[in-house]
Amino acid sequence: MLLCILLFAISGCKTYDYDYYGTISGTVLDYTDNSPIENATILMMPGSQTVQSGPDGNFIYDGLEEGQYTLSVQRSGYQSERKTVEVISGETVTTSIYLKQIPE
């Protein structure tokens, strides 16, 4: 009886085809010396999801539908930068975004 209940419950669960979604994996770097930039804010459009770059400059967006996305990157002391990437289902797009320091 318990087995029947479990099978019934499992059959009603949705499954997701993870190959349907793509990922953007990127690194924010200093234009001059290629050093990683920590705590840069990356805004993804369309949508309004933001993430912060880690100590190694890395960031990731996953579970994205196929299509074009524009990344707008900002960090205090640097000029903002935008980059458009194409997400393909089941794949990871790897990108680097270079920020130029604002002269003092």
PLM features per residue range, with description:
Residues 60-68, 76:
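Short Pro-Gly-centered beta-turn/loop motif in secreted/extracellular proteins
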Residues 72-84:
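A short, solvent-exposed loop/turn motif at the edges and junctions
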Residues 59, 81-83, 93-95:
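Short strand-edge motifs at loop-to-beta-strand transitions and within beta-strands
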